Amino acid sequence: MSRMNTIYAVIDLGSWYIRGMVARKMEDGRVSPISFYEEPANNCIRHGCVHNIDEAAAIIRRIVNQLNENLEDNTHITSLYVGVGGQSIASQEFIVRKAMVPEGEVIRTEHIESLWAEMRGASFPDKEVLDVTDPLFYVDGKQEIQAKGVFCHELEARFQLITARRSVKQNIRIAIEERLGLRLTGILVTPLCEAQVLLSDDELTLGCCYVNIGAGCTSVSIYKNRLLAMLRVLPMGGYNVTRDLTSLRLTEQEAENMKLNHVSMINDNKSNGSFRMTFADKFSEREFRSSEVNRLAKARMDEITANYLNILRLSGLLEDIGAGIILNGGGTKINNYMAAMKKILGEVTPAKIRMDRIDTDNAISFIEEHISTIGLAYKATQPCTDYITTNLGELVSQIETKEEIPANDTVQDLFAQGRQTERKENEQRDNTDRQREDTPKQTVKKKEKTGPSFGDKLKGAFIKFGSLFDEDTNQDNNR
C-alpha cells in the first residue's frame, strides 16, 4: 500500500486541549492532513497525563467520531497513535560497552546489533521505556559518528531511553482499548515528534535547546551533534499563569483572555496605565491596573523560565548549543515574552515548521495548533483505518437516500468536494514527476564571537533573575 493510500490517526493529550488528526503522507514522507478536531480537556489531563480515564475516553470518542465524518465512505478509524509529554517523562542515559578481541578488530553490523540487544534488556523500577534514540558511539574512548568499519579494541554506545511512570501507558491503554474498543498502535513522545518537524538540519547539527511551554507542562529537549542529549519535562506551564490571574476574582476563561490580550513581559508606557475588560455576561465591566496584572504574570513566567534555564545549565551543554534556544508553545505567546528572552540571551528564536515535513499545498499544515499532531503523524508508520465493505443492496439504498436529500453548501459539503478534487489531482500526479518549489534553506552558521558567549549570558540571567525581564520590575513591586 502506498503512503498516499495509508491514513494515520493521532491523538495529542494536552493539558488544556485534547487534539486529534487524520493525515496521509506524500511519497517523500511529508504529512498531508485530512482533518483536525480538538476539545477542551476539562481537567481530565493533568500535567500531560491521563487523570480521569472515563472523561478522557469520552472526549477522544467524540474526536474520533468527528474525524471519521471527514473520511471516505465506509472508512473508519480502528486504531490510534497517542502522543504524551507529561511530567514523569525523561531521558535516561544507558551505556553499553563491548570489548573486542585483544588484538582489536573492525566493527561489523553484528557488533552494533549486539549493543542494541543488550540495551533492550534495560529496565527501571516503576518506569516503562517509551522510546529509544539513536546511540552516540565511542570507539576506544573517542566519539565516532559512523562506527561501522572502524578498527578498535572497545566499542561503546550511549543510548537515551525515554521513560515514564507505568501508569502513563496503563491509563492510555484502558481509555483507548477497553473504553473505546480501538487498538493502541503506539505511544509517541510528543516533544521528540515536534522536534522532527520543527528543528532544521543546521539547528540539530550545531546543537540547540528546544523548549515547549505548554499549558500544564514545559518540555526541554537538548540536542547535540544531531542526537538527543537530554529530555526533561517540568510540571508547570501557561495554565499556571492563568490560575494566578484568577486571584483577581476572574473565572479561568476570563483569566485566559486577560493573559492573551493584556499581559506583557516588558514594561512600556501601557504598563503604567489601566484597561477595562468586559465579562462573559457582556454587560459588566471592570478596570484593572496593568502593573498589577503584569506583576502576577511575570512572577510565574520568571519561575518557568528559571527552571528550564536551570535544566540547560545542569546539563553541562551550554557551550554545545550553537543554534541557541528554540521556543514553542502557547506560553511563549504571552506579549513580549520572546522579545524579553532575546534581550537577555540573544540566541533565542521561535520554532518554525519545516517545509520538507508538510504538504505545502495543504492549508491545514500551517495552522500553529497543529504542530504537535503533525509531528505525531510524521512519526507514525502503521495504518490506522479500515475499509468496511457494503453489499450491493445497501449501496443502492444509500445512493437513493442521498438523492432525496437536497444539496446544501455547508462546510462539510465543501470539504468533501475539496477532498474529491484532491484525490483526482493526486491520481494525476502519480503518473507524472511532481515538481515543487523548495524553499531555499538558510544555512545556520556559527557567528564570530565578538561579545559574551551564550553561557556567559545565561549566567548573567541567573545573577539578575530577581528582575529577569526588564530593569523596571522592582519599580513595579514598589508601586
From Swiss-Prot:
PANTHER family: CELL DIVISION PROTEIN FTSA (PTHR32432:SF4), CELL DIVISION PROTEIN FTSA-RELATED (PTHR32432). Belongs to the FtsA/MreB family. The gene is ftsA. Self-interacts. Interacts with FtsZ. It is a peripheral membrane protein. Cell division protein that is involved in the assembly of the Z ring. May serve as a membrane anchor for the Z ring. Keywords: Cell cycle, Cell division, Cell inner membrane, Cell membrane, Membrane. GO terms for biological process: FtsZ-dependent cytokinesis. It is found in: Cell inner membrane. SMART domains: FtsA. Residues 420-440 have a biased composition (Basic and acidic residues). Signal peptide: none annotated. This is Cell division protein FtsA. GO terms for cellular component: cell division site; cytoplasmic side of plasma membrane. Its main location: membrane. Residues 417-458 are annotated as: Disordered. InterPro entries: ATPase_NBD, Cell_div_FtsA, FtsA/MreB, SHS2_FtsA. The keyword Cell inner membrane applies. It comes from Porphyromonas gingivalis (strain ATCC BAA-308 / W83).
